[in-house]
């Protein structure tokens, strides 16, 4: 990426970003001394081991060794690539990315995204204007019970049956039409006739977390337009498997929702919201993905699924459970609402009203109850064969859960269900030993040079204590070139913190050792760091003098020294005597 997004811009982004505030938009932090702590979002953390340093603009987990700066956090937590994480920070700070001339591919993608945002927004406004003048669309929404407040809140629109009439009505320019065709927002048939993909449909805009419109969903209002439901084609800003409909609207009202209620369709979301059921979203159908699960858990600790009361809905609930199991933890849980046959959230809220539906939410089945309710279907517990097949089917699913507590709890229920009550017999159901990564800090030896580099990485302002490096140049001491390289970078960038320093070296050959040393516990108290750094620097210089002294002494024994060399060894002896 070097040479594509300028390093000065990346550094400026990190300088503007407060990593504590950024992480707190995703997870709750608690102040602990000068740092902030919480349970690690990257592994099943029983005690808070995730530390965020405002001073260093750096995070580190003592449990799983996850670490990095603001960019790394977005890459790992939001599942973004490097460029996407830069785009996210740039959006937060409302600044454009100044791609340089070498970054042609990235720049084209970035500009294409900006163009798509613009086109989607403009089309959405046209759809919204159009619905005002379309009696059939208004009649349909009225029959579905959707009021004007919801139409406005969710920016609902309508696409006319004929593009030429639509374009004339709103005076759409040819250049705009060409852009829409180029980005496949509208299309042409084999006869060259332009048509809107969503023609004859109610249009539901889909927003990203920043409120930008990234795609549309359409619902036909007559039986002769098929398919009944339609989504935009995937593009650079829209990936169906990663989007949650209604999440932006929920977050507008509740920055940290206590739960999220997942339903199947747009109208389910809208109707429940209209009836004052909070926190409702949709995964754009029943095809839930692991990305959906991860996104939902980033915004809340409890996700409740409420699919339609038919075979497709029940199958979707079971499929969702299986996909979600690896992401369940002691703090992240899922629940299920099972609706009566042939009911969906839209129909049942109209029959029952808000209070009764809220009771369904309050009494939603826990994950464990739903799991055993489904897995015990058609199982004859009086049959040893059935009990065996039950355990064969259940155990692999239970083993997907990372939480020891939940996994053991489910195994105990399974053991009791199949009639195993003796602890010794139950051993075969106990969890496999969890492999814990050996902390990187124990994989490398403590050496003076590594401590020197580690202190500098963790405290870049120490560079101001070194007025000159001439006496260290051209010396062959292991690690010294790395130290001098970092020292120069810190001197050239006096305001760098640890996070910015690591970002500077993201694509260099030394980044791995720098990452290790950035989180290395050197066990030196803060008040003594400066003196320790200077002592190590002095000792390094002494080591250089000693090596030169040995070389001159060896030469003297073999062939003697020149006058200049004799003066040099005298000077070295004098300096070393002052140690």
From Swiss-Prot:
Cofactor: how and how many bound: Binds 1 zinc ion per monomer. Binds two Mg(2+) per subunit.
Binding site for Mg(2+) 2: 308, 310
ZnF (CHC2-type) intervals: 40-64
Class of enzymatic activity (EC top level): transferase
PROSITE patterns to which the protein is assigned, alphabetical: TOPRIM
EC number: 2.7.7.101
Source organism of the structure: Buchnera aphidicola subsp. Schizaphis graminum (strain Sg)
Assembly with partners or alone: Monomer. Interacts with DnaB.
Name of the encoding gene: dnaG
UniProt keyword list: DNA replication, DNA-binding, DNA-directed RNA polymerase, Magnesium, Metal-binding, Nucleotidyltransferase, Primosome, Transcription, Transferase, Zinc, Zinc-finger
Protein name according to UniProt: DNA primase
